[in-house]
Amino acid sequence: LPSILQLRHLEWTANKSASLGICKKHVLMRMISNGLRARRASELLVKDLHFGEVPVRIYLPRSPSASKRRGVILFHGGCGMYGSISKELKEKITWKVLSFISSRYRLSPEHRYPTQSLDCVTATTHFLRTAESYGVDPDRIIVCGDSAGGTFATSTCQELVNRTDIPKIRAQLLIYPFLQSLNFNLPSHQKNASIGLMSLERMVCFILMYLRKDCSLMEAILAGSHIPESMNLKYRKWIHPDLIPEKFKQDYKPPLPASYIPQVHEETKEMFDTRFSPLLAEDAVVGHLPDTCIITCEHDVLRDDGLLYKKRLEDNNVKVTWCHIEEGFHGVLCFLGYGIFSFPSNFCSLL
């Protein structure tokens, strides 16, 4: 696809600029991603506000409603370092029945992890408490996110699930979410290691950049040397290739055993926090989560994260709607509504 080639060229430009000392990579990539502007829908009233210290953009239908509307709060993707509230799937929402909040959490590396997750919790809590002032039914609020935004949506729902001082989140929509950092040798990692916008090495490098770690740790992490055997044994009931349906394991080859490197584990401890790897949450949390829709793409290194979380939710009797895009790839949502970057597909009808 021309759009993929163009974005790869832009990333090459960002890498070259960084190597020459012209501009840091994350700064230039942020400028590039923010430069792709979606069209604003004329039927919307748009307001820029703050929920606590978190900037948000509110999209309210201009047409009157006889009853309170449903609400959506979106956390954008971008590895916690890129992206903004100025673009996302807002062009594709059915505005006559929804009010829409897009949250701009503070970005890494300027703001250290877990600032991003905490900002998402702050914005969501504020919206749940004040929804009626925006004409929204507080019992019909959906939390939504794509990629890293899907991580933040997942961890936000987990963190708020047992709160009794705020309304319950009605549902979560997770679009090709990143959900675990224990195993980077799942079938989708092997199959899609060099496919599309998000290669396996690029993903792990972005993880390390987000956590303000050195990308020289990438090789050890890809090999699994950051995980002690005790942790592998503890979590294999939730994260293991055997839990992936057989039809998704074509040509899968089990990796060679990795030698544990304690220094790498110490350097990457944040990766095992449930805010960062929500798949590690205990059943006592997962079993109380709201109805969930998970969207996965076949040509995506993160496909199996979604499949594993789907299984965990279903095993805990949480209602799950699963939509799998056979021709989809990681980041496809970013191209919706950008003229030559638009994708006429069934994807839009799922929202």
Regions found by a protein language model. Give the residues of each.
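Alpha/beta-hydrolase superfamily serine-hydrolase fold, recognizing
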Residues: 4-19, 23, 35-351
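Extended alpha-helical scaffolding regions
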Residues: 28-30
